[in-house]
Amino acid sequence: MKRSKAIAVYLLGTFSQIVSVCLLFFFLNHFSVQSNLLTVLGIIVGGISSALWGIIVANHYFHIHFKKIIKDFFNIHTSYKHYLLSFFLIILDFSFLMFGGKIIEFSWYLPFLMFFKFIVFGGIEEIGWRYVFQPILQEKLPYFHSTISTFFSWALWHLLFFYIDGSLTTLQTLPFLFGLLTNSFILSALYIKTKNLWICVMTHSIINVLSQLTVDSNRYETYLLKIFVILVSCYMVMHKKDEYNRYK
């Protein structure tokens, strides 16, 4: 499979699948059809689209078999430095808590339950976006351009998914997109530095958990902090000499 075809297959497959679910939900809503089962199935089918087509393209373009993808997804046995790097960026991303941000009250076990939930509904996305799509882009594009391109595709995918799960109407679009842009740089930098899919999955899940349990009191300070996180991520990649070793 050629590079251009791999990109086309991934994007067309991913968006055809999730748009089809959106259209189904549009007609269900139009005719006032309510079904919890269809809602759950729609969330599952739409939610796995990026991962499913990532697996397909990984197999045909990178020749990575399904068993290897699953092994990489749960590859927790990696250098402690990789975990420290992940925690460093997460702490940096949520450092607004030191400047007036608040933590919502919750039961002690809730973050653990949410973490495992977000591995399935969140972390699994990393198979498509960081493990397959952006590495293909990086064969021809610099890190910054490929990350921005991935962000736009990932953002559109999220907006479609939020239409399916019903949260689009209450979404604070600008803060969400700014956060997603920051996450795009964090996760792509982590994958380039660690070459470990699990680190991206774990980081994605932790970010989702903390996003649900924290509130920023000063949005402008939060934006400045996120810009700083993006710059740090870019700096990390600029000093990674073997950035494209996997793809050569």
Where are these regions (language model features)?
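Membrane-interface helix/loop boundary segments of multi-pass membrane proteins
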Residues: 124-151, 192-196
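Functionally important transmembrane alpha-helices
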Residues: 22, 172-229
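Active-site-flanking alpha-helical
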Residues: 128-137, 165, 202, 211
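Aromatic-anchored segments of alpha-helical transmembrane domains
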Residues: 15-23, 90-98, 119-121, 152-161, ...
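Juxtamembrane helix-entry segments on the extracytoplasmic side of multipass membrane proteins
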Residues: 103-115, 165-178
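Membrane-interface capping segments at transmembrane-helix boundaries
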Residues: 60-65, 237-248
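Alpha-helical transmembrane segments in multi-pass membrane proteins
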Residues: 8-61, 108, 112-113, 222-230
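Interfacial transmembrane-helix boundary/kink motif in multi-pass membrane proteins
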Residues: 2-16, 37-47, 61-94, 138-146
